[in-house]
Every structure is written in C-alpha cells, then in structure tokens.
Amino acid sequence: MPTQEMIPSTLPRTQADSRPETWLDVLVIGAGPTGLACAIEAQNLGFKVMVVDKGCLVNSIYNYPANMVFFTTPELLEIGDIPFTTAHQKPTRLEALEYYRKVTERFQLHICQYHWVKTVTGEDGNFRVTATDRGGRIHDYQTRKIIVSTGYYDLPNLMGIPGEDLPKVFHYFREPHPYYDCDVVVIGGKNSAAEAALELWRHGARVTLVYRGAQLPSSLKYWVRPDIENRIKNFEIGAYFKSTVQEVGLDYVQIKTPESTVKLKNDFVFALTGYHPDYDFLRSIGIELSAEQCRPACDPETLESNVPGVYVAGVIVAGSRTSEIFIENGRFHGKQIAVDLRAKLKG
C-alpha cells in the first residue's frame, strides 16, 4: 500500500508551502457523466465537492460527431434522478449536452472547466492537488478524498506507422462537409468508423473503409449495419477487410491486404481505432495497474484504489477493456463510492 512518500511530488517548494485556495471534502477529477454522478452523490451527503476537468463539461460527448445519435435510450443516461426527455426514442449529442448542463445547474455543482490536474500529493484525509488553468495560472486544492473519473476519449490508440503524424490524419470525426469531393480513408470497423464512412459518403466524399477484421462486428448499431453493408455491396463505399494500413503519405495510403499491398489515392485519413485511459496519470498518483489489461487496483465494492482515499470511477475501472463500461453502468459508480464516503467521512 503506497505511503505518502511513495506518491510523487513535483511541486516547487514555494508552491507546495503556499496555502491552498480551496479546502474540500471530495475532489472529482473529470466532468463527464460519471464524474457528475459521483459529485451529485457526494454533495447529497452534505460534503463540500468540486469537479475539475481539463476540458469542458462532458467534454467527450462534446467531441462526438455533430450528428451522432446514441445507441441507448435516454433513461439509461440519466443521473441524479433527473428525467431525460428527448424528441425521439434515441437521444442525440445535442440533447445529451443540454441535459447534462441542466443537471449541473439543478444541483449547482461547482465545476472548474479547463483546469488540468498536474500533481496529486499527500495522503488519505489530506491530499494536495495542483492544477493549471488555460492562462497557465496554478491552482492548489486540499481535499480529504479524491475520485478519478477521467474517461478514455482523450487518448487515441495510435497505429505506430509512418505518416500517422501528418496533418491530414485525424483520430476524431466531427462533420463531413470539409471532405466533399475528396478521397478519404476511414480506418476501423466499429460504430464510429461505420458512421463516419456513411456521413462522409452522403456528403460527397469518396470513401474507403479499411478494417483488420474479417467482417463488420456484430456490435454495430442496428440501423447502421444494413446501411453500411448496402453501401459496400453496391461499391458506393470501398472496403478492405483483413487489412491494415502500413503507411500514410502526402497523397496516398498504403495498405496490406491478404492478397497484396495496395496504394490508394488519398486526401484525408480518419484513424478511428479506439481510445484508452490516461495510464500515466493514474500511475503518477500511485495507482497500480494490472499487467495485461491495465485495470486499476481497486476494491470492487467501494471502488477505492490501492491508494487509500483515492477512488476510481467510470470506464477507467475497465482498463484497456473500454467496451465493458459505458455511461449506462458507469453512472452508478457514484452511489457505490458514496456509501464508502459516508462511512469514512461521517462515521
């Protein structure tokens, strides 16, 4: 079990010796739906709670494709027992953004957006958290407990190939218009890749899908599967299965297929190959990660990590198996943690 000395401290002495600007019972790192749910549950117990995020409120949802429709129904995205009403059976990205804004206002949650947590020092009951804002100003917070709910959408899974760092390569898809009349390669075969390929094709791009799998996965949204399959069948969207990208050039993409190597004319690439949690940040706090799947060591009942007083919540609990936890089940982590907070902070 890590001691105070085992948790790294990189604060300059003058900064570390200064008086924290805020004293808290609970600091939540990450303002996604799960982080908000954790803050609500802790605040409902009467604790002084603050949420910090290096981006905006529900930053991952904001970065979803502009016209994205959720696979789930609205009630499965609800937090804080606040109803989520939508115009149709499936909620849209815009509806979700509005809902989480309203929930934040309803509970008057203290959210510090665009605050990047740099260091966590101290011990259970007396942690020191240092963050920087957009202007580079340093903020110090002292808190009794910490909940880490940083998600995974910030860090794409890189392919490690030549040309991946070219400005024509993107790991997120927002909207199709800029790629009209362009040759576009979409790498991946899951929902994000299939939907991006369809959106691009509908808006006049010449699209080729490259996927390492033998066929499209069964997890595709039920309304997306027949659409993408028909576009491929009719040769409206090109597709290479059991194939990988070897190199990205200024005006081409080279792929390896089961039969040969193919060089495709190309203007833009969307490498939608998945994302992963910020393992380095978790390790910097002292949280141990499993060797194979990078799952954080934690009590499955309370979600307290191997660092006493530091809890993990949301998709980071699953490590690299990010498909195991969604908003639908991660939103309940706040209640699990709250039970332990009540026992330890009020007991």
Write out the residue ranges for each language-model feature.
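Rossmann-like dinucleotide/flavin-binding elements
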Residues: 1, 8, 15-24, 28-54, ...
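Short gly/ser/thr-rich secondary-structure transition/capping motifs
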Residues: 6-13, 165-172, 251-256, 291-297
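A short beta-to-alpha transition loop/helix N-cap that caps and shapes the active-site region
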Residues: 58-62, 70, 216-220
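Glycine-rich active-site loop/strand segments that organize a redox cofactor
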Residues: 62-98
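Short, hinge-like loop/turn segments at secondary-structure boundaries
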Residues: 66-71, 165, 225-228
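A Rossmann-like FAD-binding core segment of flavoenzymes
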Residues: 106-108, 112-136, 140-143, 202-293
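Flavin (primarily FAD) binding-site architecture
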Residues: 148-164, 275-287
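Short, well-ordered coil/turn residues at beta-beta hairpins
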Residues: 149-150, 156, 172, 187, ...
